Amino acid sequence: MRLHHLHVAYLDHKASSSSSSPAPPSISPSSIPGSAAFPAFSFKCLRPLAPKISLPEPRKMIAPPDFVVPRARNASKLLNYTVQVPAAGTTRWNPSAEQIKVLEMLYRGGMRTPNSVQIERITEELGKYGRIEGKNVFYWFQNHKARERQKQKRAALLTLSTLDPSLLPATANETKEAPEKKEKDVEDGLASCKRRCKAWGDGAGDGDAVVATEAAGGCTDEVTLELFPLHPQGKA
């Protein structure tokens, strides 16, 4: 009954409001399924909507110009350094005329192997005429000595090749006379051996026998005689 009275009051209120001004269409409780379980005033007390949460806008990560400019400058510097790299082979020592003149003057003065102190002084002095290092001075003296030795060897060979040809026959004659001289020396040695055997002989006959024996043997074997023989040689 109470629900019926509320429904009638709602219709009367609707009729009075529709006569004064047009009202927007409303939803009747009967059109909603299960509306009998809820009172009519529950449709008027609507729950307010939740407030809209506004999210912050995503920030755009933009690098400041202070960080960009130095990178560009560094890149340009690296490019310049890359371009300015010296080409291969430029580290080789190219002596100037003044440097060679001073080094040759020192070499003619008697300097052959300078020590570390001398090399340092020479390098400091030659640095006025161009780029030079201590190792360049050291190797220059070593190479100069090697070239001088080669020149001396070539000069000696050239001197031997240009000797007087008249000296060659004399050398050949000396070569031919060498065997004859050797034979003469052998004969002289044999004669001295015979004389030595005669001096040690006890008698004339024994001496002849000893001489004959020595002559037959060619005096090739030396015989050691006793200083005081008990028996004469050749006799028992």
Swiss-Prot record:
- Subcellular localization(s) per the UniProt record: Nucleus
**Known SUPFAM superfamilies for this protein?**
Homeodomain-like (SSF46689)
Ordered alphabetically, the record's keywords are: Developmental protein, DNA-binding, Homeobox, Nucleus, Transcription, Transcription regulation
Q: Name one GO biological process term.
A: tissue development
CC annotations in GO: nucleus
**What's one Pfam family the UniProt record gives for this protein?**
Homeodomain
Q: Which is one GO molecular function term here?
A: DNA binding
This protein's major location comes to nucleus
Please name the InterPro entries in this protein's record.
Answer: HD, Homeodomain-like_sf, WOX4
Region Disordered, residue ranges: 169-188
UniProt DNA-binding region: 88-152
Chain ranges passing through the membrane: none
Biased-composition ranges for Basic and acidic residues? 174-187
**What family does the Swiss-Prot or TrEMBL record give for this protein?**
Belongs to the WUS homeobox family.
Tell me the function of this protein.
Answer: Transcription factor which may be involved in developmental processes.
The molecule here is called WUSCHEL-related homeobox 4
**UniProt organism field:** Oryza sativa subsp. japonica (Rice)
Q: Lineage, please?
A: Eukaryota, Viridiplantae, Streptophyta, Embryophyta, Tracheophyta
What gene is this protein translated from?
WOX4
